[in-house]
Amino acid sequence: MIAHLSIAQNKKTFYDFTATTIDGKPYPLSQLKGKKVLVVNTASKCGNTPQYADLEDLYKTYGGDKFIIIGFPENNFMNQEPGTNSEIKEFCTKNYGVTFPMMSKISVKGKDMDPIYQWLTTKAENGVMDAPVTWNFQKFMIDENGNLVGTVPPKEKPKCDKIVNWITGKQ
């Protein structure tokens, strides 16, 4: 029993990480405690890129004290995000009016995978599931306590029932 408690106490949560904003500033995820967080890996030259519009709509509808979306640009799939952070920011703002937090471009798979994505995709780290990123716009659902509670495939629209019901507590 005591060994089990010490393992549980040492388990990392989403809040234990710090990301870097698209503008290069530290973004401690601990500031999101108490919110549901939808984490999405993004790309500007993908068939799923129009999901930015749905993500922004979801953010405008539900974002605030209880819910937030965080975008992580990446170039892991067929070079579909070749731009610099400033080019990505301009693209997202100009074409989709993105106001939800966007982070600096990272890697979501392979040897240079960002530690946040190592946690998101590895059951040994998140304690819930192995969930390798299969393509751009895969969605990870984080509860108010910083725990991974589910994923949504890349092709599934951000405003799907699974995500909306989770945000609104109808799940």
Protein language model regions, located:
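Short, internal strand/loop/helix patches
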Residues: 13-14, 86-135
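Amphipathic alpha-helical repeat scaffolds
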Residues: 21, 41-45
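Thiol-/selenol-based redox modules, centered on thioredoxin-like
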Residues: 115-118, 123-171
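Conserved helix-turn-beta segment immediately C-terminal to the redox Cys motif
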Residues: 35-36, 45, 49-73, 93-96
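N-terminal "domain-start" segment that seeds a small globular fold
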Residues: 6-30, 115
